[in-house]
From Swiss-Prot:
Its main location: nucleus. Residues 59-86 bind DNA. Gene3D superfamilies: Zn(2)-C6 fungal-type DNA-binding domain. Transcription factor involved in regulation of the gene cluster that mediates the biosynthesis of cladofulvin, a conidial pigment not required for virulence but that plays a role in fitness and resistance to environmental stresses including UV light and low-temperature stress. This is Cladofulvin biosynthesis regulatory protein claE. InterPro entries: AflR (IPR013700), OAF3 (IPR050675), Zn2-C6_fun-type_DNA-bd_sf (IPR036864), Zn2Cys6_DnaBD (IPR001138). GO terms for cellular component: nucleus. PANTHER family: MONODICTYPHENONE CLUSTER TRANSCRIPTION FACTOR-RELATED, OLEATE-ACTIVATED TRANSCRIPTION FACTOR 1-RELATED. One of its GO terms (biological process) is aflatoxin biosynthetic process. It comes from Passalora fulva. CDD domains: GAL4. Residues 13-54, 94-134 are annotated as: Disordered. It holds the Pfam family AflR.
Length: 446
């Protein structure tokens, strides 16, 4: 038996595979240096065995059959007895390859993949994200701070002073919208198709609402978003939205000045520059303008309807302020105006809607005039409620037809908008009733 083994060993010599060269690592740590020193001092045989690939102790046939192998080379006893092919394969170790330096998992994650282009040295993450956005949208995007500042800069750059200056009391008292009345010719010029003639629309609003947008901004949005924006774009095209926004800006600036007057009673003399005649005249003009907008075809836009409601709240607030501005005289008191007031207004007669506001009972006539002016506001609220009813019905019909079902957000916006519209109508009616009750009580006390 030993003779056959020696003969087999002579015909089939077992040669170890050539050693794999170990690459020199720049920095491997103390453990790798100690291992390399021990390998070099152990001799040539131990170095070749440790460095070379290892062979499995059992053959492939026995390992596949889950049987114990005799581990004889080149063929085990079981394979010789059954006439099977006996093959010893290399041992596959899990983990890193032998001779490769250790690298942290964090450094491996930062390495770029072989399939994608690696960014050149010196390129920051901003430029890399810019390239990704360029591949996504097909147009070069400038993500630097300078490019953002250049994109935001325009001839109509927004400044806080553009709106804060209007809130000052001096601008309020010098505003021609609340000092001088508008005649019929100016009223028709407001209602024309030119949005720039609407009570002096500010340049910022002209730029934001009147200039057409580029098609690239609309190409990014989907069909559902474009459908939801259709009514708003139609409202802008006929300038009704610009007119309502201009009215809202004027009333907001004036309301801020009124709040300043209520906090500082010493500003009462400056507030008197704004006469009751001018306030009532401009409120009537605004009510006529809003009534015409509600009758226009572009009022199918929900944004426009909401802005009409907000301006109506402002009008009711100014009627309430005018009704409460003059103090109620106690029994036995007599209203004696100052001499300066008599000198300034001795030759002036204030007449609105056939009511003469001068004389001893001027306060009562003013309150009666305000009570009469509330009737056009009530008609405006009725038109507003009718427009809301038609708008909600159109939205519900569009939802049933499947037009708004293309976008998942459309159904949520439908229910939300319906609730908002109903709440606006309820609040307008409640505010009008409360103001009418206060005016009637004030009239009884005079």
């Amino acid at each position: 038996m030993s003779l056959s083994r020696s003969v087999a060993a002579m015909h089939f010599p077992v040669t170890a595979p050539p050693p794999v060269p170990v690459p020199h690592a720049p920095h491997t740590g103390g453990l790798h240096e100690a291992t390399a020193t021990a390998s070099s001092s152990a001799g040539p045989t131990s170095t070749s065995i440790a460095a070379g690939p290892r062979v499995r102790s059992s053959c492939e046939t026995c390992a596949a059959s889950k049987l114990k192998c005799s581990k004889e080379r080149p063929r085990c006893a079981r394979c010789v007895k059954r006439g099977l092919d006996c093959t010893y394969v290399l041992l596959k170790r899990a983990g890193r390859k032998p001779g490769q330096p250790q690298t942290s998992s964090r450094s491996r994650r930062r390495e770029p993949s072989s399939g994608g282009p690696s960014p050149p040295s010196g390129v920051t993450g901003t430029s890399t994200s810019s390239d990704m956005l360029q591949d996504l949208f097909g147009t070069p995007l400038d993500m630097t701070v300078d490019g953002f500042d250049a994109a935001m800069s325009d001839s109509s750059t927004f400044h806080s002073s553009d709106l804060l200056d209007d809130h000052s009391l001096s601008a309020f008292t010098a505003d021609p919208f609340f000092i001088h009345g508008l005649d019929d010719q100016q009223l028709h010029s407001i209602c024309d198709d030119d949005p720039h003639s609407m009570l002096g629309v500010p340049p910022l609003m002209n730029h934001a609402l009147m200039e057409p947008r580029t098609p690239r901004a609309l190409s990014i949005s989907d069909n559902g978003s474009q459908h939801l924006r259709t009514g708003r774009l139609d409202g802008v095209s006929c300038s009704c939205l610009a007119r309502v926004l201009s009215l809202f800006q004027r009333y907001s600036a004036s309301s801020e000045s009124l709040c300043m007057h209520q906090r500082k009673p010493e500003l009462d003399e400056r507030l008197e520059n704004v006469s009751t005649q001018s306030i009532l005249s401009q409120n009537g003009t605004a009510v006529e303008l809003l009534s015409g907008i509600l009758e226009s075809p572009c009022c199918q836009d929900g944004y426009l309807v909401v802005m009409v409601a907000l301006v109506t709240f402002k009008i009711l607030g100014w009627y309430s302020a005018v009704a409460q501005r003059t103090k109620t005289l106690l029994p036995g008191e007599r209203h004696n105006p100052s001499p300066s007031f008599d000198e300034q207004h001795s030759n002036t007669t204030t007449t609105i809607r056939g009511f003469c506001l001068d004389g001893e009972d001027s306060e009562r006539r003013t309150v009666q005039l305000i009570l009469g002016e509330l009737h056009p506001v009530r008609q405006l609220i009725e038109r507003f409620a009718l427009r809301l009813k038609l708008l909600v019905e159109e939205m519900q019909d569009a939802d049933k037809a499947g037009v708004a079902a293309k976008d998942l957000c459309a159904n949520a916006m439908l229910s939300t908008s319906t609730l908002v519209y109903k709440q606006l109508e309820t609040d307008l009616r409640s505010e009008w009733r409360a103001l009418s009750a206060r005016v009637i009580d004030r009239l009884k006390n005079l």
